[in-house]
């Protein structure tokens, strides 16, 4: 569970909420009573534990130590791995399960700057696999045939975590599985089934102050050799773009490709008339289109990305210009109150996501919209 300046980060509560929903269903289907365990590291963090229980944790494992005050990947990896493998903790969480305990069944991290580092190193320590940047989770029983993992034979895999993320096209789901090898020559287990979860994808549950749970205080085993890196100071770097202060957002995508500079200037003029912030789709941030340096450095930057790889927004008005509607982009703007899309492809997927779809080229449509907006402003000013 990530936290900063006295607050648990939203993505941690989002993950906890999804874990709660998954395990309420899991325990009902499998007639079990397995627990959702939240692990939190830091210094002077005891007060967080009750909040995590209110947000869905059955058990909170709290590692409170002065050397855990600031994030250091080496130490945090070591302590989380210690906790994950500790049979004494397992016996406190579920005595009946402790004898057969080896590793947790599942483990979730945030797909943010800290979680992306931490998830990879922890899963290496636990000798399992990692699915990154996940948008959807399902637990089910599967029957799988795989040439290597099952020696080409149909094999049952119980309580398997299906981890979903958009494929490289952005329009189809990729399902990632972390399965044991059952082939005799290479037989081995892969636990926990782990993933990092995109912030903003899941919703926290409503906190329940009356909810009860168990708090376990863990004494981390930190040695002098773990302290080679010292954190001297830290500061929060504010984003170059703040979507929250504007009621409207105008975004553009690869539809600008025929004339990047000219088309981006059109988008900027429309945004100006709407008093809107400017966003972009993920491919634009890769700077693969031949735009000028001034245009590229101003508009084609990661801070403007809308979607699961960027910002999740909910303005009163969202205008998508030349954006086809990949799933990862839709996830970032679908909470907008009113959505307008401008696209020459009448079969573009974004057509199904908007309130108004304008089938046309941006070069033709935007000048007409700008002209009409100017007329309306003149009427307002005259009145």
What are these regions (language model features)?
Residues 1-383:
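N-terminal glycine-rich FAD/FM-binding segment characteristic of electron-transfer flavoproteins
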């Amino acid at each position: 569970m990530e936290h900063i300046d006295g607050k648990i980060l939203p993505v941690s509560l989002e993950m906890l909420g999804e874990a709660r929903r998954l395990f309420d269903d899991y325990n009902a289907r499998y007639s079990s009573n397995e627990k959702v365990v939240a692990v939190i590291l830091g210094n002077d963090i005891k007060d967080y534990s009750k909040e995590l229980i209110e947000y869905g944790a059955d058990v909170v494992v709290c590692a409170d130590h002065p050397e855990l005050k600031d994030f250091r990947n080496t130490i945090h990896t070591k302590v989380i791995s210690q906790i994950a493998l500790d049979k004494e903790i397992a016996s406190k969480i579920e005595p009946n399960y402790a004898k057969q305990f080896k590793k947790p069944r599942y483990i979730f991290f945030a797909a943010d700057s800290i979680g992306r580092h931490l998830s990879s190193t922890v899963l290496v320590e636990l000798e399992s696999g990692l699915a990154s940047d996940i948008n959807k989770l399902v637990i089910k029983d599967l029957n799988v045939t795989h040439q290597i993992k099952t020696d080409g034979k149909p094999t049952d895999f119980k309580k398997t975590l299906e981890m979903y993320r958009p494929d490289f096209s952005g329009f189809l789901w990729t399902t990632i599985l972390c399965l044991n090898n059952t082939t005799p020559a290479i037989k081995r287990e892969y636990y926990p089934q782990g993933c990092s979860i995109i912030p903003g994808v899941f919703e926290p549950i409503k906190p329940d102050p009356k909810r009860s749970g168990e708090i376990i205080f863990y004494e981390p085993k930190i040695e002098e050799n773990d302290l080679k890196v010292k954190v001297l100071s830290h500061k929060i770097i504010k984003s170059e773009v703040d979507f929250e202060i504007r009621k409207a957002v105008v975004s553009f995508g690869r539809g600008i490709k025929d004339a990047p500079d000219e088309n981006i200037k059109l988008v900027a003029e429309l945004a100006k008339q709407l008093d809107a912030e400017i966003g972009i789709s993920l491919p634009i941030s890769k700077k693969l289109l031949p735009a000028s340096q001034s245009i590229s450095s101003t508009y084609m930057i990661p801070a403007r990305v809308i979607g699961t790889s960027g910002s999740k927004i909910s303005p009163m008005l969202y205008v998508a210009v030349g954006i086809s509607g990949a799933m990862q982009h839709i996830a970032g703007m679908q909470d907008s109150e009113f959505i307008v899309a401008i696209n020459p492809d009448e079969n573009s997927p974004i057509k199904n996501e908007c309130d108004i779809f304008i089938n046309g080229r941006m070069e033709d449509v935007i000048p007409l919209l700008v002209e009409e907006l100017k007329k309306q402003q003149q009427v307002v000013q005259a009145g």
